[in-house]
Amino acid sequence: MTWVAHLVRTMDGRLGAQLDIAGEGSWEIPLNGVESFSVTVGKDQLRRIDPSWWSPYRASVAVSWRREDGSLVAWIAGPITGPPTETRSTATFECRGIGAVLERRVLTAQEPASQSTSAQTEMMAGRLAYRGMSLGTIGQEVVKRGMAKVGGTLPIAFGSPREQGSTLNERTYEGHNLANNGVWKRLTELSGVRNGPDIAFRPRWNAEGWLEWVMVHGTRAQPQIAQNWTMDLDTTSSLSPVASVDVTTDASKLASRVYWTGAGEGSTTMVRVAEDRSLLRDQMPILEAVGSTSDSANPDLIREHAIAALAASRDVVTQISMRVDGADQRCEIGRWRVGDAARVTLGDEWLTVPAGTSPKRIISAKGSWSSAMVDLEFQDDAIPTPDDYLDEEEIE
């Protein structure tokens, strides 16, 4: 069991040469973020490969975990983001997930038909309106629109169900709002509202042996990405695959009231407020926070951002860090993914977390190519219900 790296062509996922990993390198996968990793190879090998196969953004690197039976599980993949850093004998490529390409795509209702002023004015006057869809389904449409461009093809498949209905969500993206219409930015906003879906682009090898990224996301009923296996980690057992465990806490974002601003200037700026007065019990002083989505004039969306920010600010954030053996069947790389829930058992030595077994969400994973050891970060899930908080219309 080991790591295996390949070059692939970004636009269609065509498989290129296998790379001999010559240095340690590292990788990191955050929840709802863009992955990052580096791969070092010998320059002698690169000289035997057409440079177009390691050209920034034209080419990608896919690193897979080779299981005991020899099968490959694609683990992390994405474009090479710049020329390699060189020593006399090696070249190191910095890579990011496919989100690095989506960061460089802009939502427009149509492609400019020409370079004429009238064509560009028409493009700016257009708008994209998505109605009667779950947030995850809107995310799918955003990605599809981002690929519907000359040179926009990407091997992205969609692995989560579409949800449509008249009582679901709507989003409108104005053509003139180019600075805020980045595809990745809009996906991040969809995840960031109350009960917003987790979104991930997970690489896999298809039946033809080419690479594709599968967009998966939560649903209206379950914002977390569906999983078919649950990891069980017992930190109290001497036979556990857990090598180390640490607990950290952060109270810097505690708040019982959040002000969220939207579009507008001066006294016309849109503001929505969310608060939880139950947090003021037992002589707890009020703590306030301010956030902004300056490009939105949608009052419901601004309110959702305020409520989501308040939900994330209600409690002290407790984070559990573990180092696990990713070659162990109980937590083998590829059986779990960032975003999964795991059963975590802790002892009674911790002051800030209770002893016992409880579900925790994997919010990040990182490691290196020199070993199978993986550093995992866990947090509790915190999903508010629609009636949890007051907004400004209800505040006396």
What are these regions (language model features)?
Residues 56-60, 179, 339-341:
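Glycine-centered loop/turn motifs
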Residues 73, 128-136, 176-184, 250-253, ...:
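Solvent-exposed, acidic/flexible segments
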